[in-house]
Amino acid sequence: MTVLIHVLGSDIPHHNRTVLRFFNDALAATSEHAREFMVVGKDDGLSDSCPALSVQFFPGKKSLAEAAIAKAKANRQQRFFFHGQFNPKLWLALLSGGIKPSQFFWHIWGADLYELSSGLRYKLFYPLRRLAQKRVGCVFATRGDLSFFAKTHPKVRGELLYFPTRMDPSLNTMANDRQREGKMTILVGNSGDRSNDHIAALCAVHQQLGDTVKVVVPMGYPPNNEAYIEEVRQAGLELFSEENLQILSEKLEFDAYLALLRQCDLGYFIFARQQGIGTLCLLIQAGIPCVLNRENPFWQDMTEQHLPVLFTTDDLNEDIVREAQRQLASVDKNTIAFFSPNYLQGWQRALAIAAGEVA
């Protein structure tokens, strides 16, 4: 049987590194279909830190796509597992037959599914991508994204799968010793990416709660984002006093990020799509409820796991937040499907499906 090839077709260092390390540590030892990768980006020590994997790096999207298409044409039994799919040339190859549906398996990351960019080239490309998506052999995604995808592509097979968020299961009870009282601290957004719509989120928090809370905005990723960070800072200072606004412009190490989250009482995410599942997982693990946009279908996954969900359209005050905290504290976090290690079973099944080992 031909070994499955995994494709990270865009240079997204943080996510790509997370996927590679997860496969190296959790999957490669038990499945030959978890070892072969094609990745856009620089090695930057990844080969050394993932010795169980065979990783081929490419300088750009085009060169990777050309190599993948050549492999697909040379051997029609070759199957590919695309993790996120932000590579237009690969979509066009699926649409034109360069890669066959039986060769194309896609794990939706969220941003690669939705059509939110307003640029002309995106608006021209979206209809073509939509046509190509009808030809995918199988999609893997969160419950909410599967529901969203099925509305336009009901005939494409869908399987539940969660991004392998880096988590320490021993911390599932870490919120139990935390006393929450006094001024609330609210985390706004999951990164410095513009998709977080930080300014609108800050306005929404201020409209609901005024300058009575502290807002923390993590913007250390992506790099070279200084102009936008300053734009958010100035807008924030028009709403909140300096002592109540904390803009984090430096990327935090994982342990420092966990410590930051533990200081928060609420996460506030205004984006109208599924994204930031890693931050959501870490907040929930710490006993911190989240406010989501109703257009973000991840609320379906949260309610399926009996987790409290607040919406941006709901009334928001301290009593409501404290009640959500109490509800979250009563949940057995060891049973949450999108937590580590529970998502591992989904990955093992996904590998078997993509490799053709199970129907």
Curated annotation (Swiss-Prot):
Disulfide bonds: none annotated. One of its GO terms (molecular function) is fucosyltransferase activity. The keyword Hydrolase does not apply. The keyword Transferase applies. Its main location: membrane. Pathway: Bacterial outer membrane biogenesis; enterobacterial common antigen biosynthesis. Keywords: Cell inner membrane, Cell membrane, Glycosyltransferase, Membrane, Transferase. InterPro entries: WecF (IPR009993). GO terms for biological process: enterobacterial common antigen biosynthetic process; fucosylation. Its EC number is 2.4.1.325. GO terms for cellular component: plasma membrane. It holds the Pfam family Glyco_transf_56. Catalyzes the synthesis of Und-PP-GlcNAc-ManNAcA-Fuc4NAc (Lipid III), the third lipid-linked intermediate involved in ECA synthesis. Belongs to the glycosyltransferase 56 family. This is TDP-N-acetylfucosamine:lipid II N-acetylfucosaminyltransferase. The gene is wecF.
